[in-house]
Amino acid sequence: MRRDRTRQLLDRFEVWLSDKGLSELAEPAQFLLTGRRNYSTSREPTYWRSGDVHALLLVIAPERLTDPGTLAEHGAEALEAFLRFLDETGRLHPASTKIPALLKELARAADKMAPAMADRSRWGMAKTLYTAMLADGVALGDESGAQNWFAAFNETDEQHRHTVLAALLTRQPELRDAYFVVRDGIVAALRRDQRDTLAPAQLPTQLQVPQPQTYRAVRLRPETELAVHAARSLTLHRMAALAEWARPGRAVTKKGELLDRDLTTAAEFITEHCVTPSSELVLGTEVLPVAYAMECVEIRYGKLTAGERLGELTAVLSGGASPADILSYWLEAFDCAMRPDRTPVRDRHLAKLDPIIEELEPISAWTLEALYIAARPLAWDDLISETLADSQFEGADDDKLLGLLISTSVRARLHAAMRHGAVSATWDTSMPAALDEQTRATAQRLVEQGTEPWQMLELPGLTIELTPLGTWGMRENLHAEGNIAPVKK
């Protein structure tokens, strides 16, 4: 499964803290950085701009982060250590504000953090209730204990409710008799007359308990056979070639992107190494995002270089890893390819599309699920129709625009999945001769650039299906989500 980017960096940071005898700062740093990931617009833990420090220490933490006992006292110190860690190890994103300016901002906020954390008038509803729960001896992260505590609190007497909710009631008097529902740190307040009639599907999405689904039984190939196919993934081989090219260190722009000339050089290097065309487009959309998420490459001291986890990839491709480890690595890369991270520095025009992109993100997963359920090749139009029928997307004015958006998004992700060995595509190869000259020329250019024509063009007879490796990967993910996904004996 995919590793959390913030968690990966925290693991490196904890080693750094231990070496400096500052391990006590690990817990408050974890709360702060996890809070920033969950409650701010920036999900890249190495990217810090002016105002980010103030927002984290004096807005997000006081309003939303429950203090287990170390946050108010050591939060500012922990964040200072983290910023110095980024600077000393060269991990600070090139577009970040310079460290001296960030530390000055932190110094101005440090003395204000503890009073802000103690000011109950600033606490949000979830923090107010979780703090009371913590005081009653229920640990953060104890989901069963939280459910029991909230159930008891919902039935407690009015005086106790008022004591806990006093600061909130001045702003939200309707909470006096509210019924609270909780799941994984998210809290919602319902009217008492709603709780028995409200269907689970009417709860906020974050509070809905996923109901296990039962899928068809599948027959899986032997693990050793699947591992052989996984190690042949073109995406993994391209990632290894990219890391080798980046090993000396390649300059990046302020946005953390490769220079245009280097992008071309890298694509040429990968093409030669993999004996398969690899254009700048393929490199930028299918290889770099996965290689970066998997730490095969990383930005250090303003340069793209080989990453700390490159050794894992080398072992996978060289036969030095066990079949189980090869498949685990392949699956993590598969998840990264299907849900690529957005670059932290967004062009303002592209940033306007982010709400639409967020709506489109789950669609590739629905498409793969449709293929898993079908257990056979699906014609392109049928696949899109099934995906469209399941979509909750509300960003389009009509089905025609919605279909175009979905088709474009799904084509890009399925193309990445094919290069990784998860899906296969077939089409009527005799039909291109009947296409107009311009379309045929476009198809030829796409092939020369390492892109299958069907990613960009409407080709007759196009069908998509999961490979045995893709079936295994989908089954692993469905099972991990708590679904019933049996295997044929």
Indicate where each model-derived feature is located.
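Amphipathic alpha-helical protein-interaction segments
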Residues: 74-195, 283-292, 297-300, 413
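Accessory beta->alpha helical hairpin/"wing" motif in late/C-terminal subdomains of nucleic-acid enzymes
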Residues: 93-109, 285-289, 294, 298-351, ...
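N-terminal core-binding DNA-recognition domain of tyrosine recombinases/integrases
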Residues: 1, 11-117
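Short, amphipathic alpha-helical interface elements at domain boundaries
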Residues: 21, 25-44, 50-61, 158-299, ...
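Short, charged/polar micro-motifs that form catalytic or ligand-binding hotspots
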Residues: 65-73, 225-232, 273-281, 343, ...
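Long, helix-rich, hydrophobic modules that act as membrane-proximal anchors or helical bundle/coiled-coil regulators
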Residues: 362-365, 373-398, 406-418, 422, ...
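Short amphipathic alpha-helical interaction segments
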Residues: 71-81, 277-293, 401-430
